[in-house]
Amino acid sequence: MKLFQLILILLILCTTYPANASRDTNSYDGNIFPIYAGNGAIVPPQTTLEESLKNQRVSVLFFYLDDSSDSKAMAPVISGLDLIWRNNIDLIALTTDELQSDKSKSNSNQPNYYWNGLIPQTIILDSQGEVRFDMNGMVNIDDLNKIIGELKGIDISDSKFSVESINEYNSIISEKK
């Protein structure tokens, strides 16, 4: 019996695989916001685009895939926006999986109206629903802050922020002096 237990323990220890997650690969590691940005509160979004437009709030749409290295790299920037602007904007981060099957782009109250088919895509809508920023790929957080600040009437021209990596999985947003 002891020999059986010893063999079983050895098999368990020898056949386990390490948990690997890598920001620089197009592999699925789980939701990118808790893993790479340390902020699992971003998803699911706290509001819908339709509600945000109805309430005339500035909205930031972020289209991503959990298995995209570019989306993983943008996660700390989007998390930084949430940290800085949480009570002033509606941040709506959406995976594009469900949007790929919905080809209708006629309703501007729905996110797929704005998605151009590429990821990551960051869009800023003003309180009237007009697109004020639309860019694919990596975006500088200061560029986003400048546009949001202008739309909210808040002067943040003296503030500059940077995304600093703590390790491969976590980053922080800090203000540059």
Q: Language-model segments: what does each one mean?
A:
Residues G137-K177:
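Thiol-/selenol-based redox modules, centered on thioredoxin-like
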Residues S79, D90-R132, I141, I148-K152:
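Thioredoxin-like thiol-disulfide oxidoreductase module
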Residues I42, Q56, D67-M74, W115-L118, ...:
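Solvent-exposed, acidic/flexible segments
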Residues Q46-E50, D70-W85:
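Typically the conserved alpha-helix immediately C-terminal to a functionally engaged Cys/Sec
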Residues N20-T48:
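N-terminal "domain-start" segment that seeds a small globular fold
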Residues K2-I9:
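Sec-dependent signal peptide recognition
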Residues C14-P18:
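N-terminal signal peptide c-region/cleavage motif recognized by signal peptidases
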